[in-house]
Swiss-Prot record:
Top-level taxonomy: Bacteria, Pseudomonadati, Chlamydiota, Chlamydiia, Chlamydiales
UniProt entry tagged with the keyword Ribosomal protein: yes
Pfam families: Ribosomal_L11, Ribosomal_L11_N
Complexes and interactors: Part of the ribosomal stalk of the 50S ribosomal subunit. Interacts with L10 and the large rRNA to form the base of the stalk. L10 forms an elongated spine to which L12 dimers bind in a sequential fashion forming a multimeric L10(L12)X complex.
UniProt-recorded name of the protein: Large ribosomal subunit protein uL11
PANTHER family: 60S RIBOSOMAL PROTEIN L12, LARGE RIBOSOMAL SUBUNIT PROTEIN UL11M
Assigned keywords, A-Z: Methylation, Ribonucleoprotein, Ribosomal protein, RNA-binding, rRNA-binding
UniProt GO MF annotations: large ribosomal subunit rRNA binding; structural constituent of ribosome
UniProt PTM: One or more lysine residues are methylated.
Organism for this UniProt entry: Chlamydia pneumoniae (Chlamydophila pneumoniae)
CDD domains xrefs: Ribosomal_L11
Protein family (similarity comment): Belongs to the universal ribosomal protein uL11 family.
Any single GO BP term: translation
Length: 141
């Protein structure tokens, strides 16, 4: 078995099921010589069950212009906004609070995100979620 030579690793955040050749995807992949439409079709097929979720994706481009990609869980801030039905966090997080997260919601987000975190303990993941929530102007009960 021969190992393909990696020439580039591209990291993007793309809404699930909505990849298209427009910027930022097209220029990033075109510069690496990747078939842009091929990536868009594969990504959209793989993420059709997560429409609209902002998904981090890591694209590995090989010397023969083939690629593989790994999709990750949405960022914690996106999960919090989705849970509380918010458009954005507070512009002044220390003064203006825009919502409240319960411990059950924090735990659900932490469990979902732990797959991508380098954390073993649920308590550590919960603290990270709580910190992100506070920086967005959201109270944690």
């Amino acid at each position: 078995m021969s190992v393909k030579k990696v020439i580039k690793i591209i990291k993007l955040q793309i809404p699930g099921g909505k990849a298209n050749p427009a910027p930022p995807i097209g220029p990033a992949l075109g510069a690496a010589g990747v078939n842009i439409m091929g990536f868009c079709k594969e990504f959209n097929a793989a993420t059709q069950d997560k429409p609209g979720d902002l998904l981090p994706v890591v694209i590995t481009v090989y010397a023969d212009k083939t690629f593989t990609f790994i999709t990750k869980q949405p960022p914690v801030s996106s999960l919090i906004k989705k849970t509380l039905n918010l458009e954005s966090g507070s512009k002044i997080p220390n003064r203006n609070k825009v919502g409240k997260l319960t411990q059950a919601q924090v735990e659900a987000i932490a469990e979902q995100k732990m797959k991508d975190m380098d954390i073993v303990l649920l308590e550590s993941a919960k603290r990270m979620v709580e910190g992100t929530a506070r920086s967005m102007g959201i109270d944690v009960e």
